[in-house]
Amino acid sequence: QPFGLALVIAPWNFPFLLALGPVVSAITAGCSVVVRPSNDAKYSAKLLHDLIAQYMDPDVCRVVGAGHPGDGIDTMNAVLDQKEFDVVFFTGSSRVGRIVAKKCAEHLTPCVLELGGKNPVIVSEDCGNVDLAAKQCVWGRMLNCGQQCVSPDYVLVHESIEKEFTEKCEKWVKTFF
């Protein structure tokens, strides 16, 4: 059975992907959706608002907050205080995730939190392709300026291949950028 009304609180990085992915999942599961884009991506939020308003039934999907006149809701806390949501999906920082979880707990609203974290990469001495490992580490860290929840935060490299790995990373940074 569908949960009912889902609230999707989207982050500023990847503003369309990380808003629309949960929206599609919720609608596919039979839920209607309210999307709360980030204030830090106001132009993307405005476009998302305009497109959803133009192409979606407002009883199925609508956008609130992020400075859109007429919504009457301009902060995340105000949105969460509405008590109308049956499930909340939040993508963002651990700090804000705690706030969302606390607000949801007040109303016994189930929530899904996709939070940033520490993402180590381990390159062992028996790594079959140090060049490929370096390439993937550099690409993963630099993609979207490193502003993604799955971006490598640090690399633990076995000392026997540390020099080779570092040289390969330098090569890939120069190649990509």
Give, region by region, the residue ranges found by the protein language model:
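Conserved small-residue-rich beta-alpha loop and adjacent elements
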Residues: 1-55, 59, 108
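Conserved residues at the C-terminal ends of beta-strands
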Residues: 9, 67, 91, 140
